[in-house]
């Protein structure tokens, strides 16, 4: 019996040949821990300003499409377009995205940066879609986390409760949030977050539960359905004129929707 690396060719051999094959254990993949990866790579993005980090999040989808077109190199880091296996030290777009979110959350400890993030992130489409109120540092941290890889970020110390509470909220409110379960399984994501927490022996003690309840209270006050109502209110004067052409006065109705 021979042990081989897991590649396209070895999979073909596994399916078509009579000899016994086993794949080599990928120690890097098995032992991967984003907390360690974060500590080792966070300096790679230290030169990014807070505004630049926010620009990355706001344009995440467009940036991802460009980066994934070919091998993408910045500084000493290369994100490969294709790879047979992702090692524990390899940079990927998801890991880069998570690094930037961790960096931004850390920046909320500075009052000046907190105010900058608060004012800029309010215009991000995802924050508006969630109807998330940005009243304090905790709500801003939640805003930074929206759209991020919660299972990855949950491994970083002090990010456990914000990750698990947000995962629960997304699972509970996926319909209101417009999440397509075929594209993003919220239950699976929550399970992955809990698996990460269990693997690091995280204890949900009284202090952690208290912290989680604070995040849950903020999310409970958000209104995922508010975006359309706010937009309607913005055009209410003109919309009402068209309603009147149909013999209906809708000012009161628009106010109710808002």
Curated annotation (Swiss-Prot):
Recorded superkingdom: Viruses
InterPro entries attached to this UniProt entry: Tospo_nucleocap (IPR002517)
Record text about domains: The N-terminus and C-terminus are involved in homooligomerization and play an essential role in viral RNA synthesis.
Identification of the protein by name: Nucleoprotein
Subunit structure of this chain's protein: Homotrimer. Binds the viral genomic RNA.
Membership in a protein family: Belongs to the tospovirus nucleocapsid protein family.
GO MF term (any one): RNA binding
Record localization: Virion
Underlying gene: N
GO cellular component: helical viral capsid; ribonucleoprotein complex; viral nucleocapsid
Function: Encapsidates the genome protecting it from nucleases. The encapsidated genomic RNA is termed the nucleocapsid (NC) and serves as template for transcription and replication. The NC have a helical organization.
Alphabetic keyword roster: Capsid protein, Helical capsid protein, Ribonucleoprotein, RNA-binding, Viral nucleoprotein, Virion
